[in-house]
Curated annotation (Swiss-Prot):
<dbReference type="InterPro" id="IPR056778">
    <property type="entry name" value="UPF0261_C"/>
</dbReference>
<dbReference type="Pfam" id="PF23189">
    <property type="entry name" value="UPF0261_C"/>
</dbReference>
<comment type="similarity">
    <text>Belongs to the UPF0261 family.</text>
</comment>
<dbReference type="Pfam" id="PF06792">
    <property type="entry name" value="UPF0261"/>
</dbReference>
<dbReference type="InterPro" id="IPR008322">
    <property type="entry name" value="UPF0261"/>
</dbReference>
<dbReference type="InterPro" id="IPR044122">
    <property type="entry name" value="UPF0261_N"/>
</dbReference>
<protein>
    <recommendedName>
        <fullName>UPF0261 protein BP1203</fullName>
    </recommendedName>
</protein>
<dbReference type="InterPro" id="IPR051353">
    <property type="entry name" value="Tobamovirus_resist_UPF0261"/>
</dbReference>
Length: 402
């Protein structure tokens, strides 16, 4: 089969960003790479782009009429879906470059997020100096701040856009080069600062046989791991730090989504999980903690991070929530119960040590997980950071991944 020549797809709303898009196209062509320009404007006006907005809009499940509504908000959402569907149907996508303000960034980045990890993605945006999590999500999108508004060419925007063209061209070429692969299958592992000793012991034990990919459980960290599981890029998962559930249920800032554990169910990947850092909800600096939580047990992890201890009632709730999702998993599942504590702070003499709260979590798991030959809870009579716990996790993983 003849290899398909890869191209850089350049997406912009040509009715407002056409001058900048054509400037980028010229730079990329001068650099010797093939470019496909795509108009994702919702105005319906004509443009010199190689792929018209009408062609993209036609990829919406309800057709182009769902995009060209004349209402900006709904039109952006609809065109974002249409562009995602359009891009997914192209077999020659070697990289994607987008430019835009808030609307254009919201329009282009969903299609970028849907692409596999490793396909270069660069978004030049006026929004890149703020909170970019809603745009980047669990993907490897690179965000470049435009400095000036994306509203015509000037001495600043020319330089920034030229740098963007050089960056995406370089990444495009690099992505086509083979990367050394020692043949070890990849496993995903979740970690937090307070479960670091556990994960260090686990990775040391697995390193010779597996390529250990460690994800910081910051909300997007868990999503990134599950994206790889959904893409069938992981041979197994050791989800030892499920703390993102606390933040999702109780208003923290490092929350997962309602789809946490969904990729495990969909992929059937061998899964070893545990209760790592389910004793804490994350907030920002102390003065950002919600007023309703100010009288709770708080711990200043550092000047930017304040932790709140979960109560027995909250632990019972999150135990049931996790159990409900584990029950959807039909592959091999082992969920380990560290009876001696779930984090570095949840140990005798430490700030969050609370045996009653932990017991409520563990009991909720036992009450709600439907155990089968494939889906089991495993008691481990030690602290999560004890080397014995790591050994138990590795043994369980070896057992289910043979």
């Amino acid at each position: 089969m003849q290899e398909i020549e890869q191209r850089i797809y350049l997406a912009a709303t040509y009715d407002t960003k056409g001058e900048e898009a054509e400037y980028l196209r010229q730079l990329l062509r001068r650099d010797g790479v093939m470019v496909v320009t795509v108009d994702v404007a919702t105005s319906g006006q004509g443009s010199p782009a190689m792929v018209s907005a009408q062609e993209v809009a036609a990829c919406h499940p309800q057709g182009a009429q769902a995009v060209f509504t004349g209402e900006r908000g709904s039109a952006i959402v609809a065109m974002a879906l249409a562009f995602e569907r359009y891009l997914a149907g192209q077999r020659d996508v070697g990289a994607v470059l987008g430019i835009g303000g808030s609307g254009g960034t919201a329009l282009v980045t969903p299609a970028m997020r849907a692409l596999p990890v490793g396909v270069p993605k660069l978004m030049v945006s006026t929004m890149a100096s703020g909170n970019v999590a809603p745009y980047v999500g669990p993907s490897d999108i690179a965000m470049m701040y435009s400095v000036t508004d994306v509203a015509g060419l000037n001495r600043i925007s020319r330089r920034v856009l030229a740098n963007a063209a050089g960056a995406i061209a370089g990444a495009f070429r690099q992505a086509r080069q083979p990367i050394a692969d020692d043949g070890r299958p990849a496993v995903g592992i979740t970690m937090f600062g307070v479960t670091t000793p556990c994960v260090q012991h686990v990775t040391a034990a697995l390193h010779d046989r597996y390529d250990c990919l460690v994800f910081h459980a910051t909300g997007t960290g868990g999503q990134s791991m599950e994206k790889l599981a959904d893409s069938r890029l992981l041979a197994g998962v050791l989800d030892l730090t499920t703390t993102e559930v606390c933040d999702f249920l109780f208003g923290g800032v490092l929350a997962c989504t309602d789809d946490r554990f969904g990729a495990i169910a969909r992929s059937g990947v061998p899964y070893v999980g545990s209760c790592g850092a389910l004793d804490m909800v994350n907030f920002g600096a102390l003065d950002t903690v919600p007023a309703a939580c100010r009288e709770r047990l708080l711990y200043p992890h550092n000047p930017q991070v304040t932790l709140m201890r979960t109560t027995a009632q909250e632990n019972a709730r999150q135990g049931a929530w996790i159990a409900e999702r584990l029950n959807r998993c039909e592959g091999q599942v082992r969920f380990l119960i560290p009876e001696g504590g779930v984090s570095a702070l949840d140990a005798p003499g430490q700030a969050f040590h609370d045996e009653a709260a932990d017991a409520a979590l563990f009991q909720a798991l036992y009450d709600h997980v439907r155990q089968t030959d494939k889906r089991r809870l495993v008691r481990v009579p030690c602290h999560i950071n004890d080397p014995l716990f790591a050994r138990a996790a590795v043994e369980q993983f070896h057992e289910i991944s043979q």
